Amino acid sequence: MNAITMRPIAESIFSEKALGRVLWTDITSHIDIPSSNRSHMDGFVVKHSDITRISQYGPIKLRIIPKRKANRKNQKLLTGRSTRISTGEVMPLLGDTVIPLEYTQFGSKNHTITIQRDFPKGSFISYKGSEIARNDLLLSAGHVLRTQDLALVSVLGIRKLKIFKKPTVAIIPTGNELTNEINVAKGGKILNTNSRVISDLIEISGGKPLDLGITPDNNDKIKNKIRVALSESDIILTTGGSSVGVRDLVAESINDIGKPGILVHGIKLDRGRVTGLAALRRKPVIVLPGPIQGAANAFIVFAQPLIRVMLGLNPFTEPLIIAKLTEDWNARKKFQNFTKIVYVKISQSVSGEFHAKPITGETTDITVLTKSNGFIMVPERLTRLKRRQKVKINIFPGLSFSSGSSIEFP
């Protein structure tokens, strides 16, 4: 991390566009809510001293005075008097208790009411500042805004919010074999699905994807794309062209542009071992493998934490589910001392217990991802997981569920 600088940036946006965004500053209330004492029920306002005799002498009668429509809060309630009030209406001066309608009875010509029972002083009144007081801290910096938070902001009359700006993440897919055309892919080319997957993962992680398009295996063209990415984005991801032990044009291009260049090329991650990590102009460059599982794994381990740092969030999310494995799982022999990512299909029994079935396949198999809805991070020291063993399952937005749906475990 010494080779890069992750400096979050603030921006102001209208509150109606802020769902899911991260607050840059605290929000404190500049008003009291309620702004004055208000009735919590439909009924009659009384002075409590007028109804204390009910418990001893039974129901009492009070004279009804008409309510003043304007400046209700300046209307005084005198002894022996009562006035009608509606839910949410401002309390008149000296009125200190509300009697619900169902405990009153109108007298002749509706000039008086009979109150059937006593209520504690202050009953059915929402006092000034009882929900929110002036200078209360309501939302803290770093909070991810939910719909109820934005409703609160609206109540406070706040039109604009200062939030963490979404980091722009550039995607540079490389390789002569790639195409975006399905018909061309049928003729021997490889359909560029990685860009779609990585772009969606960037967006759902809180970043702003910038797809710079397929780049052929040409050193100068790769360098030009990287230079564009350096000027227009905060984080750069390349996909494909990453290998260890053979000529790697992406790594060469990165090193040609400047120092420090490639910092790590090849990591102990299964799948994703040919991932490269680099730095240029204090910006992180992640060289993702071409095979889809390796690319997704490297994104989870390296790219998403960087996006979260730029958003002022904890870089690592916690596992959300504890589940029992439905079958044994064994690490591949030559990768036993690697960190392993095991994709699983989570289901839930009638009793509510979660179960996880390991999903295996080739590193290029997109179906490993489509059949799964969670994954296990298996540390280097573990080479085997046993049936019925309890494991921590990571739930990753975009891979486990879409942003517009709930998590479902059939």
Predicted segments, located by residue:
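Flexible glycine/proline-rich
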Residues: 11-16, 25, 38, 132, ...
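Intrinsically disordered, low-complexity, positively charged segments
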Residues: 1-58, 341
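Short, glycine/charged-enriched hinge/interface segments at domain edges or termini
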Residues: 44-216, 227, 355, 360, ...
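Short glycine-rich, flexible loops that bind phosphorylated cofactors or substrates
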Residues: 92, 147, 244-246, 294, ...
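Helix-rich terminal scaffold detector
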Residues: 159-288, 292-301, 409-410
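Short, hydrophobic/aliphatic alpha-helical segments
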Residues: 18-32, 71-84, 277-278
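Structural signal for hydrophobic packing residues in well-ordered secondary-structure cores
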Residues: 1-9, 26, 48, 91, ...
